[in-house]
Structure formats: C-alpha cells, structure tokens
C-alpha cells in the first residue's frame, strides 16, 4: 500500500485532519461526509465496515447516527486518533477499531451490511484485489470514491509524495464486474481539485466552492469533476 510507512508516523497521524480539513479543506470534509451518509442511510442498527478508516472521521459520525461499525486501518497511529475521536464524541462503545490490511480483512464472508472506503483506492497497489476483498465481506453494499483520470487532478498528481492512482469510468466498471459487484449509482464532484481547498482560507474557498458546485451541476459537470463516488451492490 502506498504511504503505509508514512501513515504509521504518530506526528503524521496527529496532524492529518488539521492539514487536510481545516481552512478551505472543511468544504472537502463536509462534502465527503454528505456522500457517505447519503449512500449508507439509513444507518441505524446497520452493521458497517469502514476500510482505511484513518482518524475515524466517518467512523465516529456513523456511530453517532446509530450504526454498529468497525473501523479497519493498517496504521496503529491512525487508529489511536480514531479511538481518541470516538471517546471525545462519546461513541467509543459503538465502534470497534481493528488493525488490519485492507487486502486481507479478518472477517468472514458477508459479515457486514455495508462496506465503504474513502480516500483509499488512489493508494491501492492492486485495486482488483482490494475490491474483491471488500465485496467478499459485504452482504450487500460497497461504497467508495476515486480520483478521475481525465480531470484537473491529473495536473499535479504526479508531484504528490506518494503519487495518486487515477481512474477512468471504464476502469472502475471493470473493477466492479471483476469483483462481482453491480453499479447502483454514481456521483461526481470537485472541478477544483482538493489541493486548492487545502491551501486557502475558508473565506477564499467559500466562493470557489459555490462556483465549483455550479460547474459540476452543469451539463458538462460529470466530465470536468475530479472526484467520483461509487455506490455498488453485491451481484445476486
């Protein structure tokens, strides 16, 4: 997994949320959480697995909404942040954090109602292997995001310290078919790449986000977006 050693560092884990989701990054955080809630709802009493849960941004949020949730990450440093976040939110009793490799999940087949992974597939060395594993442990739904190959993201992706795998729609559909999944729904967002939002204060990012949203909702929005959200179902 790209970045595996990087994310094991405690100082990296401690600064992760602030570096990405403060300033203009809060618009990214808000949109990602909206996408997850929309895809997985209703979550009450649902058995959910989050793969690559990181600092527990989504894990704690879904537990607060009534989900019975397990968060998996390969980094113990990230899991420590997740446990801390869960305690602060008062939902630690509803979450189980497990250190494990997303390609070898320690759960039986069809163990969860829904499985999701955010900010995961751009780092996956073998996307097909990981997709098959997510499908294996899900009894119904797999939700995930990808960065689009033909988008503004491609302009700077090469310069990122760990690189960033980009996907065309055809590649994602092939991944789904290969894993035994059927696409139920897809959404696309962020013509302006994430990197911009992280670098500017909120008062600058706000107007850009409004313009960004208008572009994405236009007739050419799907083609210009840099992020895609994929909602798939396990094939019968």
PLM features: residue spans?
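A short glycine-rich, Lys/Arg-flanked "PGG" loop and its adjoining helix->strand segment in the class I
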Residues: 128-141
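A C-terminal cap/extension of S-adenosyl-L-methionine-dependent methyltransferases
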Residues: 185-236
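Short alpha-helix
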Residues: 163-180, 186
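A conserved beta-strand element that flanks and buttresses the S-adenosyl-L-methionine
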Residues: 116
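Conserved class I S-adenosyl-L-methionine
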Residues: 1-43, 45-54, 197, 206-212
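Class I SAM-dependent methyltransferase SAM/SAH-binding core
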Residues: 55-104
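Short, glycine-/aromatic-enriched active-site segment of Class I SAM-dependent methyltransferases
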Residues: 144-163
């Amino acid at each position: 997994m790209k970045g595996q050693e990087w994310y094991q560092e405690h100082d990296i884990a401690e600064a992760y949320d602030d570096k990405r989701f403060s300033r203009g990054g809060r618009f990214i955080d808000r949109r990602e959480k909206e996408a997850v809630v929309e895809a997985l709802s209703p979550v009450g009493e649902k058995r959910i697995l989050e793969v690559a849960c990181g600092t527990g941004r989504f894990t704690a949020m879904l537990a607060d909404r009534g989900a019975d949730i397990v968060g998996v990450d390969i980094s113990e440093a990230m899991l420590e942040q997740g446990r801390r976040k869960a305690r602060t939110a008062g939902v630690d009793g509803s979450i189980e954090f497990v250190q494990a490799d997303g390609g070898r999940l320690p759960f039986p087949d069809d163990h969860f109602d829904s499985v999701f992974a955010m900010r995961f597939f751009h780092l996956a060395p073998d996307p097909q292997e990981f997709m098959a594993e997510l499908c294996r442990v899900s009894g119904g739904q797999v939700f995930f995001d990808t960065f689009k190959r033909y988008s503004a993201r491609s302009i700077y992706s090469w310069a990122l310290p760990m690189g960033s795998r980009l996907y065309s729609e055809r590649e994602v559909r092939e991944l789904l078919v290969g894993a035994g999944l059927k696409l139920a729904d897809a959404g696309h967002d962020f013509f302006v790449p994430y990197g911009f939002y992280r670098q500017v204060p909120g008062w600058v990012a706000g107007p850009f986000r409004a313009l960004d949203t208008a572009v994405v909702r236009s007739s050419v929005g799907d083609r210009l977006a840099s992020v895609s959200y994929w909602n798939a179902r396990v094939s019968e």
